[in-house]
Amino acid sequence: MLLDFFVLIGISNCFSLIFFDIKIEGFISIDCGATSDHWDESTDIFYKSDKGFIDTGTNNEIAPEYYYSNPDYGRQLRNLRSFPQGTKNCYTLKPEQGKNSSYLIRAFFYYGNYDNKNQVPKFNLYVGLNYWTTVDLQNIATPAFPDIIYVPTSDIIYVCLINTGSGIPFISALELRPLNKSLYPIDEGALYNGWRYNLGTSSDDKDFVR
């Protein structure tokens, strides 16, 4: 299966439905490295710890001085799971809708100097057998939020972190959201988010497009 390319145009009202309405059936929200499940007040979403989704890796906490201050993101960027052992470590997702459905999958990465090395790692991310992206953070205090639209041919989706020899892979959070398949009608495979534009927002926004 080839990894196709798409431009995702986000309209604020649509994204509020996709990301902030916990009542939508089929959400999977994982706070990687968390010791327990919790309700995130900033997003109104219930996050589960990654116990049961993966059995490898090590839980780590971000030092308070590196807490990410953006109010749109809550506790899930205050801890992470790192993978010092093995070349390939995978999360196992079992969405309620099963195979041949369309899903938006988003991964969160925030280094925050959790290991006190001041050295941002670089590693690859796969969904199933498809290369998704290379996680290459700008600095220790800048997060990354890559997302992808994926239509699996199996009831199980594997999201895998691949050690490429440039530092220990880690992940802060992982989310899956079911989509109406008519939005991006593909039978199988993946669509990678190339750009995102905010239409109709304040002209002060540097990514403003009307």
Regions found by a protein language model. Name each.
Residues M1-R210:
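Compositionally biased, intrinsically disordered or flexible polar/acidic segments
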